[in-house]
């Protein structure tokens, strides 16, 4: 086999793999009404456009599910609706996680005690991107992710990078080009300063699943090794 035919074969295989991966990337990232009501993993927000991530671009206006900055309504105050992502519905009809939501009067969801974190637990991070409140407890909703939030899906996002004296994001979140912490293409893509940046950040598509990014760069290299 000639060098030319080998190269052609490698390029053809890479193109086929990339095409398949592009479909996989779309399916992996889409959620909500754009993908049959799919929920994002690890409490990632489903944006109004149906993509998973963290930060105001995903958790702000129009957020469909996950660690949305504005708590969703539920229970008797929300027409009997239950919360997405297995969150608790508080006695006042707001979705979240932690004692304010899952404690006394909780209407539905996994009511349970708080998990300690941050300044209350030697700097421990909360699981599944939950917020660590200013008081050192894990949860979701404005009581945990609002003012004083130490780590996790804080709203608004923490500042980082050159815009914040070189600070890095907690939870290995990405520091966007604009100096905000989050997850998803708007934070981990082009211009990402630190954290789990996409290797192919300059316009190269990536798959977001279980908080890991997998770039097509590695796919091409793997195909090249096979021929």
Curated annotation (Swiss-Prot):
Which keywords annotate this record?
A: Chitin-binding, Disulfide bond, Glycoprotein, Lectin, Pyrrolidone carboxylic acid, Repeat, Signal
The reply to whether Transmembrane helix figures as a keyword in the UniProt entry is no
Task: Name the residues of the propeptide.
Answer: 202-227
Which amino acids does the record list as binding substrate?
38-40, 90-101, 142-143
Q: Name one GO molecular function term.
A: chitin binding
Pfam families, per database record = Chitin_bind_1 (PF00187)
InterPro entries from the UniProt entry: Chitin-bd_1, Chitin-binding_1_CS, Endochitinase-like_sf
Q: Residues bearing Pyrrolidone carboxylic acid?
A: 29
Instruction: Please list the residues annotated as glycosylated.
Output: 211
* Signal sequence range: 1-28
The organism sits in which domain of life?
A: Eukaryota
Question: Is Signal among the key words of this record?
Answer: yes
* Protein name stated in the entry: Lectin
